[in-house]
Amino acid sequence: MRTLYLHIGFHKTGSSSLQLALHRCRAALLDRGVEFAALGKKGNSSGAIDVEARDTGLHFHLNDRFRQLLAATRSDTVIVSAEHFSFLYRPVDIERVRDICAEHFDRTVVVAYLRRQDLHARSFKQQGARGCERGRSSSSKLLGHEAGALPQLTPAVRTYYDYFSKLRQWEASFGRDALQVREFRPARLQGGDIVTDFASLLGDGLDIPPCRVNEGVGRREFLLTHKLIELGAAPGDIRRLKPGMRGDSSRVTPGRDNARAFFEAFAESNRQLSERYLQHESGLAFSDDFSTYPETGNDLLSCADLAEWSADLLGSGIENPRGLRDALLDDCIRSLLEDPVAAGTLSQGVAGELQGIRQCLARTAAIAPARTPWWSRLRRKKRSGR
């Protein structure tokens, strides 16, 4: 009997670490009769899912590479890991996954690791700050680049983080017994890490040495990258600014109330998730303790930040760095004036002075437009992968 272990993510739950560990041990695994099949060089098979941003929203499609990958396997026990499977939510797409698996395997085990929504979104949005342009990464397409450590609750974001509804669709196609649902938290993982935990599902005493892939970004890179992309800065300019952003080891964090509100947006889904797949004493599948968050977040770009970072910006070699700095400064003041809480503390005179500063900055603030070289139009549009 042939068995497929299909690891579907989610994103930001140690998937890269698991994939790299499996990739490094693929020869030893094969000696034990376990085949790790992958599309990517580091073990990620997310290239089997196309992710497209259209005017009507995000669209996810299983492409032919998944069938080709499974068809090339030979062992009785096979592992495939692709966190982009966690994007799928339409019954027709998940049924297609099931049908392709059934062509080659007698049994499929679907493995999903979940993370509390606010913690997940904070980490996933960091991934979008590693790039230099809108729409190149799955994080950019799903979460966007608006200000704040957490994304806006768009329909696509609500769909992605409705874990219960999504898992019900996987159950409808594969059956409840086929699902292995785990919380991505050291205290609830075998051995305290995802690699050891996943190996325990395979049985036979398999030992896979853990590894850790750290993909976090510092606060400076997070705030500046997201803001520059939001303002439409040229990707080449952002790329030249990156070295100056990376000297900051601090991490961006939302305020406690904002994090709790994001989590509570999925309260009903989490109650059902706790009842059926991921029981927790809180009744919400995850801990409802938010004490690790500060009362006030550090996830908004401030004038003080720009004063501290201006030297690196001005010396970056980009076109018109002063114009870019002034555009960032103008945006900071605009945000301050439009914030109902902050604006309520400003006297009429101070608000007027800030408006005057904006008028002065309007004469110098400038974002250099992106220039698209002719050869870039020949590049195949990125639809899958990270």
Where are these predicted regions, by residue range?
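Anion-recognition interface
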Residues: 1-371, 375-378, 385
